[in-house]
Design a protein with these regions (language model features):
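Helix-rich C-terminal "collar"/helical-bundle subdomain used as an assembly and partner-interaction module
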Residues: 21-130
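Long, charge-dense, solvent-exposed interaction surfaces that engage phosphate-rich ligands
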Residues: 1-12, 16-19, 34
Length: 130
């Protein structure tokens, strides 16, 4: 699996999280694991994606156009548009809470309190609960 395919899977996963589609979220996660993607790598991409969504939401609130958002974030305009659409599915508080939960999971994994695979799985279950 290429890096861009993995990033795309994370994008799809966040969409499923926003729609509270737990089965789809977990299927995407298990598929990534099956393809030898590390849970830690998945966690890092989740954090990156949430941070991007937060940044887009912030710029959108300031009335920035897709072109300006793309330029400021150093991404192609179509990516900025996709991020903007996805950002509408989350509140700022939800995104902040998700980033914080990712940080706590990261710490629990690094301190040996939980395995990386289970830690990320529990996080995804938490994010996608109704």
């Amino acid at each position: 699996l290429t890096s861009s395919q993995t990033t795309n899977q994370i994008f799809v996963m966040l969409e499923a999280i926003a729609r509270k589609q737990r089965e789809k979220v977990l299927t995407l996660y298990y598929d990534l694991i099956e393809l030898k993607e590390s849970p830690f790598g998945i966690l890092a991409l989740l954090v990156r994606q949430c941070n991007q969504l937060l940044q887009v939401k912030d710029l959108d609130c300031l009335g920035k156009s897709n072109g300006m958002i793309a330029k400021q974030m150093k991404v192609p305009a179509f990516v900025a548009g996709k991020l903007k659409d996805q950002a509408k599915m989350f509140s700022m508080d939800t995104l902040r809470d998700m980033i914080e939960a990712c940080a706590k999971t990261d710490e629990s994994i690094k301190t040996g309190k939980i395995s990386d695979r289970v830690g990320v799985e529990l996080l995804l279950i938490q994010f996608s609960q109704k």
